[in-house]
């Protein structure tokens, strides 16, 4: 009997490319989102490094007073930054080919817009890639949902806030001191510390840190004993072993006695959902707060609302914050305007001594 073997027709180059992109056997999963993520993030990182080292000063306020941000122009790691695109450009799309020369593009802060736009695309695609890999492995999609919190925060400070304020020059500078400057000016102009959504974000971040530390220390301490009481419990384990070492019943009992019974989770899924949801929801709220303050819906300002029976103002901590805000607003962008908006109003605010 003769067997005839037919050679399978070689698949096309495109089919092989599609198979490689979507394969979960690769050391690093690429995915269709990765096809966009990889070049955009590489572009953002490359331009950031070059600009941080060598970019010339940028006319951020659009008043012909360039601000230096790179290492070669006198900065160090702490003071250096990618200076935001000039106020003279506003919200206009400003790629290299829109400028008369590369020198003009650099002077007007073109690299900032290039980095921010590519970075934004890259992190959105990273989130999509998380979902895509979860989908291909038959997992649920909550990893990408959790990652949406930092994506929302970055979108708020780099995209939404400049749109609301009318210029990319109001975006957050890409550097340490620049970030602090952004925070101080944001407080001066929007009173973010008195915004409930920022308060929820603080509770989310600090609460998440606390719960993470509590959970990690409790799991590390709740070992299933493999030794006699005369030996160290640690002697029964090897670092990185595959066998389960954690007893949730013991951990639940410990924590229930330390605080009270219902403060402790006895269900692992409920516990880990809580650990994920607490900081994620807090950061969502902060991003939402930044996005509303972008359009000048600001934090609470009680405007010296506590008065005695004679109508005299009784200063509260809120009034002290207001006074600090005025000082910070006076000091920023000193040459861009004669008076900050708050101080240029018809009636000067009373500070009562």
UniProtKB/Swiss-Prot annotation:
Q: Which PROSITE patterns match?
A: REACTION_CENTER
Q: Which reaction does it catalyse?
A: 2 a plastoquinone + 4 hnu + 2 H2O = 2 a plastoquinol + O2
**Entry-annotated residues carrying Phosphothreonine:** 2
Which residues are processed away as propeptide to yield the mature protein? 345-353
Question: What sections of the protein cross the membrane?
Answer: 29-46, 118-133, 142-156, 197-218, 274-288
BP-aspect Gene Ontology terms: photosynthetic electron transport in photosystem II; response to herbicide
Name of the gene encoding the protein in the UniProt record: psbA
Q: Where in the cell is it found?
A: Plastid, Chloroplast thylakoid membrane
The chain residues annotated with the modification N-acetylthreonine are 2
Mention any additional remark: 2 of the reaction center chlorophylls (ChlD1 and ChlD2) are entirely coordinated by water.
Q: What is its main location?
A: plastid
What are the entry keywords? Acetylation, Calcium, Chlorophyll, Chloroplast, Chromophore, Electron transport, Herbicide resistance, Iron, Magnesium, Manganese, Membrane, Metal-binding, Oxidoreductase, Phosphoprotein, Photosynthesis, Photosystem II, Plastid, Thylakoid, Transmembrane, Transmembrane helix, Transport
Q: What is the lineage of its organism?
A: Eukaryota, Viridiplantae, Chlorophyta, Ulvophyceae, OUU clade
What domain of life does the UniProt record list for this protein's source?
Eukaryota
- Name the family the entry cites: Belongs to the reaction center PufL/M/PsbA/D family.
Q: What does this protein do?
A: Photosystem II (PSII) is a light-driven water:plastoquinone oxidoreductase that uses light energy to abstract electrons from H(2)O, generating O(2) and a proton gradient subsequently used for ATP formation. It consists of a core antenna complex that captures photons, and an electron transfer chain that converts photonic excitation into a charge separation. The D1/D2 (PsbA/PsbD) reaction center heterodimer binds P680, the primary electron donor of PSII as well as several subsequent electron acceptors.
Q: What is its EC number?
A: 1.10.3.9
- The entry marks the following residues as binding pheophytin a, namely 126
Q: Which residues bind chlorophyll a ChlzD1?
A: 118
- Residues marked Stabilizes free radical intermediate (site): 190
Q: What is this protein called?
A: Photosystem II protein D1
Kindly list the positions annotated as binding Fe cation: 215, 272
- Subunit structure, as described in the record: PSII is composed of 1 copy each of membrane proteins PsbA, PsbB, PsbC, PsbD, PsbE, PsbF, PsbH, PsbI, PsbJ, PsbK, PsbL, PsbM, PsbT, PsbX, PsbY, PsbZ, Psb30/Ycf12, at least 3 peripheral proteins of the oxygen-evolving complex and a large number of cofactors. It forms dimeric complexes.
Please name the source species: Tupiella akineta (Green alga)
Main EC class the enzyme belongs to: oxidoreductase
Annotated positions binding chlorophyll a PD1? 198
Q: Which GO terms describe its molecular function?
A: chlorophyll binding; electron transporter, transferring electrons within the cyclic electron transport pathway of photosynthesis activity; iron ion binding; oxidoreductase activity, acting on diphenols and related substances as donors, oxygen as acceptor; oxygen evolving activity
UniProt-annotated binding residues for a quinone:
215, 264-265
Question: How would you describe the post-translational modification of this protein?
Answer: Tyr-161 forms a radical intermediate that is referred to as redox-active TyrZ, YZ or Y-Z. C-terminally processed by CTPA; processing is essential to allow assembly of the oxygen-evolving complex and thus photosynthetic growth.
């Amino acid at each position: 009997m003769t067997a005839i073997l037919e050679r399978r027709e070689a698949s096309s180059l495109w089919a092989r490319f599609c198979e490689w992109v979507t394969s979960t056997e690769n050391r690093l999963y690429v995915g269709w989102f990765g096809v966009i993520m990889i070049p955009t993030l590489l572009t953002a990182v490359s331009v950031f490094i070059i600009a941080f080292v060598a970019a010339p000063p940028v006319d951020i306020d659009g008043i012909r007073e360039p601000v230096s941000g790179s290492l070669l122009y006198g900065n160090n790691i702490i003071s250096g930054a990618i200076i935001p695109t000039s106020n003279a450009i506003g919200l206009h799309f400003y790629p290299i080919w829109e400028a008369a020369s590369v020198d003009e593009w650099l002077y007007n802060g073109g690299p900032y817009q290039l980095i921010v736009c590519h970075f934004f695309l890259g992190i959105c695609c990273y989130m999509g890639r998380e979902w895509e890999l979860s989908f291909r492995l038959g997992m649920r999609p909550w990893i990408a949902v959790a990652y949406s919190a930092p994506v929302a925060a970055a979108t708020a400070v780099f995209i939404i806030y400049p749109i609301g304020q009318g210029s990319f020059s109001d975006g957050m500078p890409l550097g340490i001191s620049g970030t602090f400057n952004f925070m101080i000016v944001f407080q001066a102009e929007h009173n973010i510390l008195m915004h409930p959504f920022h308060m929820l974000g603080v509770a989310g971040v600090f609460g998440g840190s606390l719960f993470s530390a509590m959970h990690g220390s409790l799991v590390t301490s709740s070992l299933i004993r493999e030794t006699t009481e005369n030996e160290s419990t640690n002697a029964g384990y090897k670092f990185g072993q595959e066998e389960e070492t954690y007893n949730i019943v013991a951990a639940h009992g410990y924590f229930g006695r330390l605080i009270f019974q219902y403060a402790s989770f006895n269900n692992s899924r409920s516990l880990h959902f809580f650990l994920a949801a607490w900081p994620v929801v807090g950061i969502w709220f902060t991003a939402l707060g930044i996005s509303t303050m972008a359009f000048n819906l600001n934090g609470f300002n009680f405007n010296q609302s506590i008065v005695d029976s004679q109508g005299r103002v009784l200063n509260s901590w809120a009034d002290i914050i207001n006074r600090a805000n005025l000082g910070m607003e006076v000091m920023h962008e000193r040459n861009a305007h004669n008076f900050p908006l708050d101080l240029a109003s018809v009636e000067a605010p009373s500070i009562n001594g």
